[in-house]
Regions:
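A ligand-binding cleft/hinge motif common to bilobed small-molecule-binding domains
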Residues: 113, 130-138, 185-189, 218-250
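Ligand-binding cleft/hinge of the Venus flytrap
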Residues: 80, 93-103, 182-201, 232-236
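Extracytoplasmic small-molecule ligand-binding "clamshell" domains
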Residues: 29-129
Length: 310
């Protein structure tokens, strides 16, 4: 059974939030070829690998490009002042392009809700985006679990109810997006309360956050890295809200998405990422962006069932 004290064994200390602010765009952006920064290109293992390149599907080899959908989720993926995509996802994408000898073309498709349809419609070969893996998502697409994410609590700015932990949410109104990892986390936690939480299921995350801003809900839970960054900088989805950085709840995965009828691309990407893990390139990228504690040691796919709450 889920415990309130389920936390990351390695504390997410040293998170670096000296990043440029960005705002998620509603409109789809133009495709950008991911060109690695010099520091990424020099990382160990970031070099053309013939064996991995040979394992690509013929369709990718023919066009010499992988079309990737993403969305803006700082600090994982965002745009700098010049409009260039930067962050963990951009660096990983650029490194994959070098290793596989193809152009990786990333397009910001706007809201996170557009990510799954981007793959199912076959407009894109895959996504590289900080989307939470769960068993329901895995029924639609294959999910490559490429990093962990913790979850934290968000309240209205100032935290007038003095919420400090999940126990403090017992008996409170807690808004969650329908059918998500966060919803299952809250429901599991509420089952341990003497007075259950009043769980408010709301279709979209922006409306969940608005419910907290307006006082309809007392709190919500959301991804740790994004919540802390946007609230500390009072930018984007974090405006008017406060995250609790000392609260690091059950770990889940963030995943890349690939259509289920494309196992050859999935397996090539998994092998390429594992190559980056073992060479040291992947952990170096995670450390560069201050998220080293969220790095995986083994790249798996469709592994949500192994998480504490799924």
């Amino acid at each position: 059974m889920y415990s309130f004290n389920e936390t990351l064994k390695a504390g997410l200390t040293g998170i670096l939030f000296a990043l440029l602010a960005s705002t998620t765009q509603a409109a789809e952006g133009a495709a950008m070829k991911m060109v690695p920064d010099p520091d990424v290109a020099k990382l160990p293992g970031v070099a053309f690998n013939q064996t991995l390149a040979d394992s690509l599907p013929a369709s990718i080899k023919d066009k010499k490009a992988i079309k990737v959908a993403t969305d803006l989720t700082p600090p994982i993926s965002f745009q700098d002042e010049a409009g260039k995509l930067v962050g963990i996802d951009a660096d990983i994408a650029a490194a994959l392009g070098i290793i596989l000898g193809v152009d990786v073309q990333m397009t910001n498709v706007g809201a996170g809700a557009a990510i799954v349809p981007a793959v199912l419609s076959k407009r894109f070969d895959m996504t590289i985006s900080g989307i939470n893996d769960d068993i329901e998502l895995e029924k639609q697409v294959d999910v490559i679990d490429y990093m962990y994410d913790a979850t934290t609590i968000m309240t209205i700015k100032g935290n007038p109810l003095g919420i400090k932990n999940m126990e403090d949410l017992c008996g409170k109104k807690v808004a969650v997006p329908v059918g998500t990892f966060q919803a299952r986390l809250v429901e599991a936690a509420s089952a341990n309360c003497a007075t259950p939480m009043n769980v408010m299921s709301i279709p979209k995350m922006p409306d969940v956050l608005q419910a907290v801003r307006t006082g309809r809900a007392d709190a919500t839970v959301n991804g740790y890295a994004t919540s802390v960054y946007t609230t500390e900088n009072q930018t984007g989805k974090g405006v008017g809200l406060q995250a609790l950085p000392d609260v690091r709840l059950a770990v889940g995965y963030l995943g890349m998405l690939i259509a289920k009828d494309n196992p050859q691309l999935r397996d090539t990407v998994v092998a390429s990422l594992q190559h980056m893990v073992e060479s040291g390139a992947y952990p170096a990228i995670m450390e560069k962006w201050g998220l080293g504690p969220l790095a995986v040691k083994t790249v798996k796919f469709n592994d949500a069932a192994s998480m504490p709450v799924n």
